Amino acid sequence: MITIALPKGALLEDSISIFKKAGLNFSDALLENNRSLTIESECKRAKALLVRNGDVPVYVSYGQADLGIVGYDVLQESELKVAKLLDLEFGGCHMSLAVKNTSNYSKPTDLPANCKVASKFTKTARAYFDDLNIPVEIVHLTGSVELGPITGMAEAIVDLVATGKTLKENGLSKIDDLFYSTARLIANPLSIRLDSNPLRDVILSIESFKGT
């Protein structure tokens, strides 16, 4: 049986739709009264694990799942070994650098040296500023990073931005985009090397249906 790690939250519905087109129906996961964290497909050929987006690479890397769907932003933060197979072209949002509207910063190089930048994505933020040769202190937050500039703790934030509504409502605006993040299909490297026909068939089906 194929095991698939599916991300709970914003990516779940489209993830289930992708696998349904490939012949694996996990629609029970979308039922309002569902509390189960494991869902067997109607055809009994696969089961899904419903996990947090950030945990998908963990389950896939350690072999508890053969396949998974996860945001590119998570893959950029993770150092776990997974096979990156396909850009599924949904769940799009930008990883962005943002500052207060009242600041005088219009580009990254305007930020003062050694200023504080708040982010959930510390590895991504550090790599970005290192590439620009801009010395900053990265402050790791797990909640609403917008509060960093609002409270004066940080001059800027690095965070995911979909519509920009949250930034606008909190008096912030983007001054740069680091990258565009979409959902990605990943696999356990050993599962791929074993070259299971059912697994390969699912991957090929998804490749043919993605973006439709």
From Swiss-Prot:
Reaction catalysis annotation: 1-(5-phospho-beta-D-ribosyl)-ATP + diphosphate = 5-phospho-alpha-D-ribose 1-diphosphate + ATP
Top EC class for this record: transferase
Metabolic or biological pathway: Amino-acid biosynthesis; L-histidine biosynthesis; L-histidine from 5-phospho-alpha-D-ribose 1-diphosphate: step 1/9
Domain of life: Bacteria
Listed SUPFAM superfamilies: Periplasmic binding protein-like II
Any one GO biological process: L-histidine biosynthetic process
Pfam family, one: HisG
Compartments, as annotated in UniProt: Cytoplasm
One GO molecular-function entry: ATP binding
Keyword tags: Amino-acid biosynthesis, ATP-binding, Cytoplasm, Glycosyltransferase, Histidine biosynthesis, Nucleotide-binding, Transferase
CDD domains, alphabetized: PBP2_HisGs
GO cellular component, one term: cytoplasm
Subunit structure: Heteromultimer composed of HisG and HisZ subunits.
Domain notes: Lacks the C-terminal regulatory region which is replaced by HisZ.
Family that this chain belongs to: Belongs to the ATP phosphoribosyltransferase family. Short subfamily.
Function: Catalyzes the condensation of ATP and 5-phosphoribose 1-diphosphate to form N'-(5'-phosphoribosyl)-ATP (PR-ATP). Has a crucial role in the pathway because the rate of histidine biosynthesis seems to be controlled primarily by regulation of HisG enzymatic activity.
Name the UniProt record assigns to this protein: ATP phosphoribosyltransferase
Phylogenetic classification of the source organism: Bacteria, Bacillati, Cyanobacteriota, Cyanophyceae, Synechococcales
